[in-house]
A protein has these predicted regions:
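Short "lid" loop at the C-terminus of a central beta-strand within the Rossmann-like core
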Residues: 155-156, 187-191, 216-218
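Conserved Class I S-adenosyl-L-methionine
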Residues: 169-170, 194-215
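Alpha-helical subdomain
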Residues: 163, 188-195, 201, 268-283
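SAM/dcSAM-binding transferase cores
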Residues: 2-29, 44-50, 219-285
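Short, basic/glycine-rich phosphate-binding loops at helix/coil junctions
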Residues: 38-46, 149, 181
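Conserved beta-strand signature within the Rossmann-like core of class I S-adenosyl-L-methionine
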Residues: 179-186
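The AdoMet/dcAdoMet-binding core of the Class I SAM-like
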Residues: 16-18, 31, 50-174, 178, ...
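N-terminal glycine-rich anion-binding loops that anchor highly charged ligand groups
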Residues: 30-39
Length: 285
């Protein structure tokens, strides 16, 4: 998590929300009106209800870099979010790009209702949240309908296998507009075999792919989050790299030859051979 949370206070009381077993809302001890959402022991989201532009988790800032660069600053966009959590990025987009049309989906109905009730978002936001399977939901969306697609889906601390394949990436690419960006959150560590295969998978579907993460994670020295950014057209790589370098947790951007060497001949993943993302070590959180 990186910083402290406490169960002492919260919106309507902190701790385990009624009717949502395994889920905790923890007040941020260092920041007022801010909360950590923890699911099955895994810190899933952080939200600042007073300032949605504040992003505590470094991987979320890396996804936000893509959201910032997909269109001119302040211009409304159409965004799809696979995995709702506490809707941190959707709140960010609504705040930084007023008038954006956003849809999000999550399979966990009690969690979505708890977030709606306990961590309400700005009513002016054009944000609709549905309940359902991310892959089925994205398959029902119209082609060329989104400027930004974010895949941040975890069952506990692992991404389900069916959300890691060429077939799934193909559905996300189908709904992405020509100038749009796809951002995928990946949890991995040590050999980074899962991430290498995911980069190969994204490349099998979209011609332009980059990967960003902290150097220690890219070297396999610790388990953490890596973010894939992909699109039909060349990426805003210079700006992405500059923002990654200037982030409070500095990151590197891999693309082109650097990404070739990282992937190092790994084959794309298909439904028939897909597996869940690796589980983090017990002491990560």
């Amino acid at each position: 998590m990186g910083r402290r949370g406490t169960r002492d206070t919260g919106p309507d009381g902190a701790g385990e929300p009624e009717g949502v077993p395994g889920t905790e809302l923890l007040a941020d001890a260092d920041r007022s009106d801010s909360w950590f959402l923890v699911v099955e022991g895994t810190p899933q989201s952080h939200v600042d209800l007073s300032d949605p532009s504040y992003l505590d988790f470094s991987y979320m800032r890396r996804i936000a870099h893509a959201a910032d660069l997909v269109a001119p600053a302040g211009e409304p966009i159409d965004a799809l979010h696979l995995g709702a959590g506490a809707l941190t990025l959707a709140r960010y987009v609504a705040h930084t790009r007023p008038g954006s049309r956003q849809r999000a989906v999550d399979v966990d109905a009690p969690l979505v209702e708890m977030v709606r009730r306990r961590l309400p978002w700005d009513r002016r936001a054009q944000l609709r949240v549905g309940i359902g399977d991310a892959r089925e939901w994205i398959g029902a969306r119209h082609a060329d309908s989104a400027d930004l697609v974010v895949s941040d889906v975890f069952a506990g601390a692992r991404t389900p296998a069916r959300l890691t394949s060429v077939e799934f990436y193909g559905e996300m690419a189908r709904v992405l507009r020509p100038g749009g960006l796809l951002a995928v959150n990946i949890g991995d560590g040590h050999s980074l075999e899962h991430t290498r295969a995911q980069a190969a998978t994204a490349r099998a579907v979209l011609p332009h792919v980059a990967l960003t993460a902290a150097p220690a994670i890219l070297r396999g020295r610790r388990f953490g989050n890596l973010v894939l950014v992909a699109g039909h057209r060349p990426l805003p790589s210079e700006d992405l790299g500059r923002r990654a370098h200037r982030d409070p947790e500095m990151a590197r951007l891999l693309e082109g030859g650097d990404l070739d060497r990282f992937v190092s001949g790994r084959a794309p993943v298909h439904d028939a051979d897909a597996v869940d993302s690796p589980a983090p070590p017990d002491d990560v959180f």
